[in-house]
Amino acid sequence: GNECILLVDAEPLAVKAITAELEDHAPIGRLFDMDVLRPDGSKVERQELGLPGRRCLLCGESAQVCARSRKHSVEELQAKTREILREAVDEADSREAARYACQALLYEVAITPKPGLVDRENSGSHRDMDFFTFQASAAALQPYFAQCVRIGRQGGTPTETLRALRLPGKLAEAEMRRATVGVNTHKGAIFSMGILCGALGRLDRKNWADPDRVLEECAAMAKGIVSEDY
């Protein structure tokens, strides 16, 4: 695997505390093996910080014991490694897509002036909502957008993805109304952005910057929806 040696001007125990934190809590930290050596060449152990030894990725027993005994096959370890990497990438992608979606909603309401519509200066023709209502709604919808991406990552046909988005969309609408005290601020965005985020989940990250490819996936998901629902 990849290796790196760093020379650090810091107290060894302090460096070990940082590396242990990364190993235990970073999304792919379980795959890191970061040793800290003192100037005399001796290794700093986790136990010196009052931390338990690392556990095996597969069975939860002592990682050191499993490694020495070669308890698990290379194939098992490779499969687990791929699973950890895939889950980390999927989680990072879902968070980023949700951030983009919420950012779009916030930017849209912030555009000023928008005659007849809610903006930073007034509520236009609306009497039941204002700029802050939209902010509350956008914040409430971020978990939903992330969920849509994760649903897209589950695979299946475009139609199956759309079907899987329906219940989360209904629950998101209820969450929106709780955040806005009953006001419909983003019902249309729940539908359209939900499909968009689901499409992003279905696509490899490298295709996100290709609007034609993204819209093609959205179209495949929404194909026949009008005739089926109406």
Regions found by a protein language model. Give the residues of each.
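Long, hydrophobic/aromatic-enriched structural stretches that serve as scaffold segments
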Residues: 145-199
